[in-house]
């Protein structure tokens, strides 16, 4: 079964390679609380809906029919030919964390090396989690650091944003590799005595409709305030409405997810001034 909450949506379907991309074959049901759900009988989908399957939502809202990626997707990939992003059902064998009992508090005062996984390599092109693990972590350790801070690594469509225009908050950037390769990076860092800090972006999200969570239910205020109040003009992005219970649940579950699933040791929260001030930190006090 699968469950989504789309309060402003009129109709929601789920489709993918498991049903030959038939958009309106599997209709989700909405309950009294605005939660949409669909049930997939095991006997029917055991051999079709499996690890690696691709899927999307077909959502009918006030902005028409849109093909969307679920907000809680844990793996999102880009088609090389069309450049479109699609959610991927990701259910590999459980990662072996045996022996990873790292305690960052024992490192004392932190000497933090900040790095961008894709840009830290000497080669031309986008670096990978595996390359960072094999080539960069030993250098960080050798130079005397005891912590590494990874710049924004959640899925993002525009590489030039350095990862700060997030589209899928629960999915590691697929251009750098698989979730398991990111987990291996963290595990190896811990073996070297390095704490791993994640740069977490909860101040805003990308405006894109095809890839992101903007207007996911067909309204402009599903995760944000309506109109200009939900727009960050300096970053050309959308602002979260932290007063909504659902937004708080979404962001807090995201905090817990990266700690539990990837064993990150802590966070550096990006754009905090934009989260707590109406002027977003762009103000002249003279």
Language model feature labels by segment:
Residues 1-3, 30-114, 119-124, 131:
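The feature marks proteins involved in alpha-glucan
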Residues 5-12:
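Short proline/glycine-enriched turn/loop motifs at strand-loop junctions of beta-rich domains
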Residues 12-14, 55:
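Short beta-strand elements bearing conserved aromatic residues within extracellular beta-rich modules
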Residues 21-23, 50, 143:
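A cross-taxa feature marking solvent-exposed loop/turn segments within ectodomains of secreted
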Residues 25-29:
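Beta-strand-rich interaction surfaces with strong enrichment in secreted/lumenal proteins
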Residues 100-107, 116-286:
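Substrate-binding/active-site clefts of carbohydrate-active enzymes
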């Amino acid at each position: 079964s699968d469950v989504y909450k789309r309060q402003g949506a009129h109709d929601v379907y789920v489709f993918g390679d498991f049903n030959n991309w038939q958009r309106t074959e599997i209709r989700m049901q909405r309950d009294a609380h605005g939660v949409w759900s669909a049930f997939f009988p095991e006997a029917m989908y055991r051999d079709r809906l499996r690890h690696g399957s691709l899927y999307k939502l077909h959502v009918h809202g006030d902005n028409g029919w849109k093909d969307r990626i679920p907000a809680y997707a844990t793996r999102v990939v880009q088609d090389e030919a069309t450049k479109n992003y699609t959610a991927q059902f990701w259910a590999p064998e459980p990662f072996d964390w045996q022996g990873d009992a790292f305690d960052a508090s024992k490192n004392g005062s932190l000497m933090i090396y900040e790095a961008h996984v894709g840009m830290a390599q000497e080669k031309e092109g986008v670096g990978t989690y595996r390359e960072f693990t094999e080539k960069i972590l030993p250098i960080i350790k050798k130079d005397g650091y005891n912590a590494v801070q990874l710049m924004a690594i959640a899925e993002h469509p525009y590489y030039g944003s350095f990862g700060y225009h997030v589209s899928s908050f629960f999915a590691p950037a697929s251009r750098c590799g698989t979730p398991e390769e990111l987990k291996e990076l963290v595990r190896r860092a811990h073996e070297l005595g390095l704490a791993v800090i994640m740069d977490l972006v909860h101040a805003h999200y990308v405006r894109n409709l095809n890839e992101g969570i903007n207007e996911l239910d067909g309204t402009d205020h599903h995760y944000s305030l309506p109109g200009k109040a939900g727009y960050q003009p300096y970053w050309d992005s959308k602002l979260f409405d932290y007063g909504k219970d659902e937004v708080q649940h979404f962001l807090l579950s995201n905090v817990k997810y990266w700690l539990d699933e990837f064993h990150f040791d802590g966070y550096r929260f990006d754009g905090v001034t934009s989260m707590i001030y109406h002027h977003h930190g762009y103000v002249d006090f003279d």
